[in-house]
Amino acid sequence: MKKKQIITMALAVFTLSMNGQNIPTIETGKNMPNQWIDRDTGHRVVRLINRKGDNSSFYFHNNPFVGNEMVFNGSNGEGKERESQVFAVNLKTGAYRQITHEPYPVRTEIVCAKTQEIFYQHADSVFAMNIMNGEKRLITVLKANNGHGSIACVNCDGTLLAGTYSTKEEEELFRKYPERHDWFNMLTEHPYQRWLFTIDTKTGKVNRFYTEVAWLNHLQFSPTDPELLMFCHEGQWHKVDRIWTINVREGKPRLMHKRTMNMEIAGHEWFGNLGKYIYFDLQKPKSKNFFVGRVDIATGEEKDFAIKREEWSVHFTTSWGENFLIGDGGSPTSVAHNDQNQWIFRFDYDGDHLKTTKLVNMKNHDYRLEPNVHVTPDNKWVIFRANFEGHTDMYAVEL
């Protein structure tokens, strides 16, 4: 018997009055009203929902939008991870509802807008759930004689999931060294064998189509080509040629950006929504000269756009027409080593560089939680997550 989906009314944030006289102009941070004008930028900021617990929008390259709704992960109660489930908020009305009602924690960022489904994994079982009616189906049970399989993304037409298999030896390394700073360098220097696989979402058939002794990670399907997958060689960025694509039917990898100098780094790559370009954070060399790189998927032609040190962001993303970019800033201890880039930024093209507009002052945000910006499909708002009120919540700033 299906559990009835709970629909709760929240703030109708995108239909609020534009009358600035009713909206306070204040510093962003601490206990905030439901909407305010950022004192330092003049841009309106709103809290997406009023819901107990932590509310977390997706990682920057995972598309959360289905129609008028945005899918997100939320904890029930006091923000305990073990109580997390999947929710959706209507960006037109402000209503939010719970999608999953599992007896175990569910966190996923795998969403197909075309089929209106989310995909998630519990132990070795892979499930799909219809966002609109809550219908759930088991797709497959991943079996590995020596290791573990994890799903990572779904293609644009919802026909294939992609993921990685790792060995028991690699899994044991994570158990033995739970802190990232311990195992990260180990895997860079001495990676284990990994496999890329797909799952047919209708039949459950699993296809291991590529393997390499490398830390294969950061999987993303093209938003327009259902057979084109991007993946990375994970590790210390100055030691790896990171960004690759592969046709999942053909199984032949293609390097999309090759480092050209010592200590050059390129990463946090993403597909533009139009499917023609791949973008990435580029530093030549690391911590010295900063760019956003853009490579044409068909031709391999690359163009790099310069930004200032104080404008660097942990993550960048593009608008839906790819005519401007958004960045989420960074902490003073990030790779840019600058105490002036704690902002949500807008970047507009200006020849071979990007000119910047500041949207939100993030000086009261702890960047151990990365904001991970998303532009709404109407290109009018930027959604981000933040903890400047003492817990993880979701906000939107008006462009």
Give the positions of each predicted feature.
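Loop/turn-rich, solvent-exposed surfaces of beta-rich toroidal or solenoidal domains
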Residues: 272-293, 301-355
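Blade-level signature of beta-propeller repeat domains, shared across WD40, Kelch, NHL, RCC1
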Residues: 369-399
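Conserved blade-ending motifs and adjacent loop-strand segments that build the rim/top face
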Residues: 262-264, 304-317, 351-377
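Asp-box/WD-like beta-propeller blade repeats and closely related beta-sheet repeat scaffolds
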Residues: 102-194, 208-211
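A short helix->beta-strand "capping" segment at the edge of beta-propeller domains
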Residues: 36-56, 356-360
